[in-house]
């Protein structure tokens, strides 16, 4: 859904025509190929795991995915007095700059770009809301924070039906939380 919304409103995104979608391996390989760009970041050795460039690439992707999916303000992190926090923000900024320069988007960025599009362009959000009568989400226990926010934006907190089993949360590694389904009735 998010990718379709982006495609339909591409001119309002950071992407240009003919952008390329990265899967998990492509994302990590992109970072691996460009690891030299990260090695120059002051203090990076304090936030990276021991090991070679592939381990670093994996950690960089995890930082970016986790912060993106939680809609964390990277600019606020950059000015944080804690050196580790500001270093991680520099790492994520460097990665996001690479995506922009090469006209790429990864799975987490799809969600963030869609969320940004919906929150910054109220006319697009209203058009989408008017075209959607009901939202049904299966496996709701596997949604993450940003996915839930997009669902609530599109549904305007109305006519949303979710189905899931809090004993079957499988995507915690992608930021999914069973808290979404447990707290859904109160939202």
Name each region found by the language model:
Residues 2, 124, 135, 140-151, ...:
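Catalytic P-loop NTPase motifs of RecA-like helicase/translocase cores
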Residues 1-113, 122, 130, 158, ...:
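A basic/glycine-biased coupling hinge at the interface between accessory DNA-binding modules
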Residues 115-119, 145:
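Short gly/ser/thr-rich secondary-structure transition/capping motifs
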Residues 118-134, 155:
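Short basic/glycine-enriched coil/helix segment immediately N-terminal to the Walker B
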Residues 145-187:
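Conserved RecA-like helicase ATPase core segment
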Residues 131, 139, 165:
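Walker B catalytic acidic pair
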